[in-house]
Design a protein with these regions (language model features):
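Non-catalytic localization/regulatory regions flanking kinase domains
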Residues: 1-233, 244-247
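Structural motif at the C-terminus of the N-lobe alphaC helix and the adjacent alphaC-beta4 loop
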Residues: 229-233, 256-267
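Conserved HxN/HPN-centered segment at the entrance to the catalytic loop
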Residues: 238, 263-275
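Activation segment of protein kinase catalytic domains, centered on the conserved DFG
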Residues: 300-318, 341-347
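Catalytic-loop of the protein kinase fold
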Residues: 327-398
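Activation segment/activation loop of eukaryotic-type protein kinase catalytic domains
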Residues: 370-372, 377-429, 435-437
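Conserved C-lobe activation region of Hanks-type protein kinase-like domains
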Residues: 434-526
């Protein structure tokens, strides 16, 4: 099977028992026996001749059907790939089985003068580092043959990616491992901190079930309840986010943020399926969305009927509940895997707080300092994904889908009474507090969880503009409020507020741009749609 990310292919786990079965192994062993005479005459070594009964027993042993319950299927497959199937008997005799793979390369110094460094293959973690006899029978293998064995063993060791219920797995994949990706295509525009790929993972090599979150019992208005495990739909196509950073702390920060919010996953939050590291590059695996919200607005023609208005209102309510769920997440100062906001100083203490651990039962954590609630930090249309088949409970012919918040790369924890700065929020959707704090005119202005509320409100206004006038309405709304932004090197941005300088001795103040108020002051729509405008 070809791999989309490696020149060398892989053999899917489910195919191996079909290819290496007792009948096929018996036939191959008999072929090897018949060719032994030629090798004896050529190399002048003794090779034991196997009877038919011995071959049958050996085939059962190779396929794991003997009392040992060891399998040598992968070993035989590797030997077939390098055209050395008759050597399987030496591996079986020494007990070098599939569970010993991958064998490690160990460099050795030749005792002969003027000879280059050599190497052999040995079991992983062997404290005595014993050379394996199977690579010396009937004579020492050539270096090129050993290299081929080491190379092709990875074709049988494609990793299995999975999750275990609410637990998230983080995999450290060997650099030589062949990922079981049958398709790997970049999607969307290049982001500032990551690339996103559409990856088709072979069904034998993942255990992900993309849940229909609308069917979960624990959806709730604000995501208070823990979701159950509902019937799920299986897909082999996922979104893989490849981080540009090679800083492990940045990767662990985003992973841990997802792990924290996944404990009570809200219907309108994207679930992280797993994460992995290979070649020092970090990846996060998610369900594949149909589009981000901006692309949805651009390509989807709006409908101004009551059902469409209800859907927009429901999605806005759901997104607000998802943001509230994020804000209810918190951490303690001793949780080193969480990154505190710059300058954040915790106040107060938490005694005996029960924190449900991802990989174990709840534990009591005595007297740890409260490090703060979480805020997303970068809510914008591009960080809201549209899933076309996510609203199965809607009683309509064509489900309109579900919106879910994604990208926790900028999410941070900060005690909500502590001033913070240095946000990575997209300039257009930043709140006035960010500019007032940055200018130093209001050093006591709080930039906390309200940061997200402002950003989400901006998205809602654009959502209404799209609902009323389509993508053209979104663009006109942006053009009307676009002004020179001193905080962004005097570029024009479409932020939603103005900073008015105060008179002598007075502080600056922020106010909403008039163009924003114009959206609310538009003439009323049909009576069935008025509630959406409000």
């Amino acid at each position: 099977m070809d791999s989309a990310v490696s020149k060398l292919g892989f053999i899917p786990d489910g195919q191996l028992p079909k290819l290496i079965n007792q009948d096929a192994v018996t036939l191959e062993l008999k072929k090897c026996r018949d060719s032994i005479r030629k090798r004896i005459r050529t190399y002048n070594f003794k090779e034991p001749k196997l009877t038919d009964d011995e071959i049958t027993k050996l085939a059962a042993k190779i396929c794991g059907a003997s009392e040992e319950r060891k399998s040598y299927r992968k070993i035989l497959a590797i030997l077939l790939l390098i055209d050395r199937p008759s050597r399987i008997t030496h591996f079986v005799d020494e007990g070098v089985s599939d569970q010993d793979l991958p064998l490690e390369i160990v460099e050795t110094l030749s005792t002969r003068p003027l000879r280059r460094r050599s190497f052999d293959l040995r079991r992983r973690g062997d404290p005595l580092a014993k050379p394996l006899r199977c690579f010396m029978c009937p004579r020492k293998w050539r270096k090129s043959t050993v290299e081929r064995f080491e190379k092709y063993q990875w074709s049988l060791l494609a990793p299995f990616l999975s999750q275990d219920g609410p637990r998230l797995f983080r995999f450290k994949i060997p650099d030589k491992a062949i990922l079981p990706f049958e398709r790997w295509e970049r999607i969307g525009q290049q982001g500032g901190f990551s690339h996103v790929y559409e990856a088709e993972i072979h069904p034998d090599h993942h255990g992900f079930h993309v849940q229909d979150l609308d069917a979960q019992d624990g959806r709730g208005d604000h995501g208070h309840e823990t979701t159950t495990n509902p019937p799920s739909t299986r897909s082999n196509v996922f979104a893989v986010k490849r981080l540009k950073t090679q800083n492990r702390d940045d990767f662990l920060h985003e992973f841990d943020m997802h792990k924290r919010v996944s404990k009570n996953l809200h219907q309108h939050l994207i679930p992280l399926l797993a994460a992995y590291e290979q070649h020092g590059i970090y990846h996060l695996i998610f369900p594949l969305a149909g589009a981000d919200l901006e692309k949805y607005w651009r390509n989807k023609e709006q409908e101004t009927n009551q059902e469409a208005a209800r859907w927009v209102a429901e999605q806005c309510q759901g997104l607000a509940g998802a943001v509230a769920a994020i804000h209810r997440s918190y951490t303690l100062s001793d949780s080193l895997s969480f990154r505190a906001l710059p300058g954040g100083q915790s106040e107060g203490e938490t005694q005996g707080v029960n924190m449900s651990q991802t990989n174990g039962p709840p534990t009591s954590i005595p007297r740890q300092r409260f490090a703060g609630h979480c805020r997303h930090g970068d809510i914008k249309p591009k960080n809201i994904l549209w899933f076309p088949d996510g609203s199965r409970q809607q009683k309509e012919t064509t489900p309109r889908g579900t919106l879910r918040i994604t990208d926790f790369g900028a999410a941070q924890y900060a005690e909500h009474r502590v001033p913070t700065s240095g946000s990575q929020n997209t300039p257009i959707y930043r709140p006035p507090e960010a500019d007032l704090t940055a200018q130093g005119t209001e050093p006591d202005v709080i930039v906390g969880t309200s940061y997200d509320i402002w950003s989400l409100g901006c998205v809602f206004l654009e959502f209404v503009a799209w609902f009323l006038d389509g993508w053209h309405g979104v663009q006109i709304f942006l053009e009307n409020r676009s002004t020179v932004d001193r905080a962004c090197h005097n570029f024009h941005t479409g932020k939603f507020f103005l900073i008015e300088s105060g008179d002598a001795g007075k502080t600056s103040r922020a106010r909403v741009k008039p163009e924003v108020d114009q959206v609310r002051s538009r003439p009323p729509q049909p009576s069935s749609l008025r509630y959406l405008r409000d």
